[in-house]
A protein has these predicted regions:
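Conserved catalytic core of nucleotide polymerization and phosphodiester-bond processing enzymes
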Residues: 1-216
């Protein structure tokens, strides 16, 4: 904690000390000392300040979804590549690839217009309303875009002679001849090739060659 206090902007520390009573009432400080909570919150705020484009997208997508839920059949945008529309009982977030994320039974509740949709709750495994917010929605979209890029790369690899025998999260495992005709450098290049909808995205793949599967 002392090291964090020295490293962060003093104004962030003071700001979070001012939020401490609120955090205690909300139960956010359970399991840690008040000073530890202030330290953690100050680090989070410092990250947000240093990554303002990301936090702006959190807010932008959150606002777009709230507007769309309250105004069916109208398209709202977030950032340069995302659009949102409520149609019938579903909220659609259109990704850069054209694929859509679908949130069933979207609704706004409470004074803060908290967003909910129906899904399988993580712990109870029951179908119920799930709260969400801008940051979580951007996380969903980011993971979906990564999935789209991986799926785009699959056929490209196989057309070049890299037979995919297994996928693990964001990895493709290919079986190739034990000679010089193919190698992991070529595979990296194929996986880093951007589709037109992702133009300008900084995408890099890293791989290795081995006689058995392992984590790098």
């Amino acid at each position: 904690v002392p090291a964090i206090r020295k490293a962060v902007d003093p104004s962030l520390w003071i700001q979070n000390e001012g939020k401490l009573d609120w955090a205690i009432k909300k139960g956010l400080v359970e399991g840690m000392t008040p000073e530890t909570w202030v330290a953690f919150s100050s680090v989070a705020d410092a990250w947000r300040r240093a990554n303002s484009h990301i936090t702006a997208l959190w807010e932008g997508l959150g606002n777009a979804c709230q507007e769309a839920i309250g105004t069916p059949n109208r398209i709202f945008t977030a950032g340069k590549k995302l659009s949102v529309k409520r149609q019938g009982a579903y909220l659609y977030v259109r990704l850069p690839s054209g694929r859509k994320l679908v949130y069933p039974a979207p609704a706004l509740s409470g004074e803060r217009c908290d967003m909910t949709y129906y899904g399988i709750e993580q712990y109870s495994k029951k179908w119920r309303p799930i709260k969400t917010y801008g940051g979580r929605l951007v996380e969903n979209a980011t993971q979906a875009v990564a999935c789209d890029l991986l799926l785009e790369a699959g056929p490209r690899l196989e057309e070049a002679g890299y037979e995919i025998v297994l996928s693990v999260h964001d990895e493709y495992i290919c079986e190739i001849p034990d000679d010089e005709t193919r190698n992991h450098r070529q595979m990296e290049e194929l996986m880093s090739t951007l589709p037109t909808w992702a133009e300008g995205l900084p995408l890099v793949a890293a791989g290795f060659e081995s006689y058995r599967y392992r984590k790098e």
